[in-house]
Amino acid sequence: MKKYEYPELGEVLYKERLENGLTVAVVPRPGFSKKLAYFVTDYGSIHTDFTLDGREIHAPAGIAHFLEHKMFDLPGGRDVSAELAALGAGTNAFTSYDMTAYYISCTENFEESLRLLIEFVSTPYFTEESVQKEMGIIDQEIGMNEDAPDSRVFENLVSSLYREHLIRVPILGTSRTIREITPQMLRDCHRAFYTPGNMILCVVGDVDPDRVAEIAAEMLGSEARSVGRKLRPWQEPMDSSGEDPTMAMEVAMPTFQLGFKCEPSQTGADAIRQEVIGDLAAEALFGESSELYLKLYEEGLIDSSFGGGFETVDGMAMLLCSGDSYDAGTIREAILSQAAKIVREGLDEADFLRMKRSALGRRIRDLDSFDSTCFRICAYHFSDFDYFRFPSVYQEVQSGEIQEFLGRVVQQNRCALSIVNPIQEESEHVY
């Protein structure tokens, strides 16, 4: 494996693209007993439309998450979680809008656990009976999600902000769409995207990098298989629908999310530059040390629940903030006004440099987390960027770029405000 050194971070990364197309990345952590492995595919809930073997396939919403659930089934009734537990390893998985990850964590029997991780993720086994059974389980999960105010306020926000992009559809799908899923559909999605050339295996821990690559090659073979081609039919305008959705739920006080549409996510070095600019813009506009945050807090418009940041998903990006408040509309007006002030007057250069150093320090400290390191290496790999190069991006970003971003993005026509009110107050107040 090729060795890459990052003296500024004190990090080393071993990386290799196997003959079968799989990328293997290993971050050594000498002396640590914990070992973590992520096996990730560049495929998430928004990738429902794709081509395979010359056919256009339009899969039901929620199929990526459904497939994640079913990958833990192996022929012969084998229980993957029980087998890993017997080896002393824990396992889990998650589906996001644009990727699906399976991971194991252990302090012993790492090689056996790694083999089992690769085996179950690479073995499609779907029966009519098991698929029908899973529908009931996921339908319950959908019901729980629909009863969660934090989920509903976000889903209502993106449904108002986005007209075409599939972030407007819940990752879990709906009770109706999951009932359209068949074993053959799951096999098609697995064959299209669970191929070595569309995946990355990332390991953090006190392990032999070459041995990790050898195991992956042994388990997956040398044949490079074709990858499904994602269809991205999103022609997304930059303006929002102009609607501010509200609903009533069992909450103690109104909760809100405010979002501003940004230009679609980038790739390569532009991807992390876009994220850094967006994060710094959020910090300058309404971060805890910002002028606006202190003003809103002193006026009682926000409390410790308030926060925000910059989010990207394949094909979209947005600046957002959220919290509990009885007057979210006033908060929106204050944010629009403060953004205009920053654009007009600029940022204090000393304050900007302190903010940039603080943000860089947080990202460096984040590398202490095995999970965060694995996740970010995988996510940025799919954006064609070497994540450990992020310090240079912070050094390059200038305060004028933050002004330009805020002037372009924080506009009335690009925003939507989603509010969940307490049931008893829905008929009494308009927010």
Q: Model features per residue range: what roles?
A:
Residues 2-15, 160-199, 233-234, 363, ...:
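Histidine-acidic residue clusters that define the catalytic metal-binding segment
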Residues 27, 32-50, 79-120, 154-176, ...:
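M16 family metallopeptidases and their MPP-like homologs
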Residues 1-79, 187-295, 415-431:
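His/Glu-rich zincin catalytic helix
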Residues 122-129:
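Short, polar/flexible loop-turn hinges at active-site or ligand-entry regions and domain interfaces
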Residues 149-153:
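Mid-domain, small-residue-enriched loop/turn segments at the edges of structured enzyme/sensor domains
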Residues 143-147, 241-253, 360-371:
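Short, low-order "capping/linker" segments at domain edges
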